[in-house]
Amino acid sequence: ETYHKDRYKVYHPKGMKSIFEWRVNGFDRMGQAGVHKIGMGVLIGLEDWRTDVTMMAIHLQYLRKHYWQTRYSVNFPRMRPSEGHFQPNVIMTDKELAQLIFAFRIFDHDVDISVSTRENAKFRDHIATLGATSISAGSKTDPGGYATYPQALEQFSVSDERTPAEVEQAVKAMG
């Protein structure tokens, strides 16, 4: 979510998730366990995204050095302003997100880059041909969302509401 240790405590003040070192060192535990693919990401909007992404890149380099047999994926989910909910501290534009994806592709040409349904369909369709390696489809964002109805506790809003079949058709149409 963020590599800013002091601010992390603000977002997770209690419980197991509140222990910053436990969260960050979780990637080492996965590597030591021989996990085939490890996904990393920072929640864009909590803190300065350039700092968070730089820290994640350094962390990725460390993990690659120590757990070279593991595959890695990254994502950069953006918080969006929404009435009545937590407001992002920093807003990232579409152009900045595209530049970040391009930069990360240059930084690590083997890393999988995922783009979530938080992004709109037009952006996802374009970025899929320019640097992203996977895009989600048909996502549910509420706890237990695939098993329970109706949606009650949505964690974030989905911008691309296409079904998996519709996303598949869009990808096929791109060639």
Role assignments for model-derived ranges:
Residues 1-40, 44-46, 68, 72-75:
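Core AdoMet radical
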Residues 4, 19, 48-49, 93, ...:
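Helix N-cap and loop-to-helix transition residues
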Residues 17-19, 44-59, 116-118:
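Active-site glycine- and acidic-residue-rich loops that bind
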Residues 54, 65-175:
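Auxiliary Fe-S-binding modules of radical SAM enzymes
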Residues 10-14, 49-52, 86-89:
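Short, solvent-exposed loop/turn segments at secondary-structure boundaries
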